[in-house]
Amino acid sequence: QFPIHKASPKAGGDYPFQFVSCHARWSIHSTWRDTPMMLRLQRGEPQVWINQIDATKIGVKDFEYAEIYNNYGSIRMRIKVSTMVRPGVAYYYHAWEPHQFPNHESYKWLIPGIVNPILMAGGYGQINHAMNRYQPGSAVQDTRVGIKPWHGQETKTYPVEKNPDATNI
């Protein structure tokens, strides 16, 4: 019997865009990600790259804000329109810190993660639960998202209930 290809499940829901990430180009992991010199190399804030065809369909232009969302949550990022991105792909560089997003959001809110039971133990310094602890640094390549224009209305959602006692949000 020959092996057959089976499509991967669409993590995050049945949305039109594949959320793809790669290593940050202008930092060493998240180190120096928010220094003025490095920010000048990359428009100064988180951005998601999409194809011109997709941008036209959605109704967004280069450098406008858009809402990126799926079943896990929603965030806002600036759009970077590029012909280098394949249609149907939303591409971003990882390692942006939540304080660099509007309203302290994070791209990690859209990424499924596996719960590590050790993180459920509390009160031990480095072992504590806070937002974004369950998600990996980069998107699983099967993560799906939708994108729509954002014109200033509030879209803030939390993927899990906000913990007022968490210190690392």
Question: What would you call each of these model-derived segments?
Answer:
Residues S30, T35-W49, I53-I169:
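Long, contiguous, secondary-structure-rich segments that constitute the structural scaffold
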Residues Q1-P36:
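Long, low-complexity segments enriched in small/aliphatic residues
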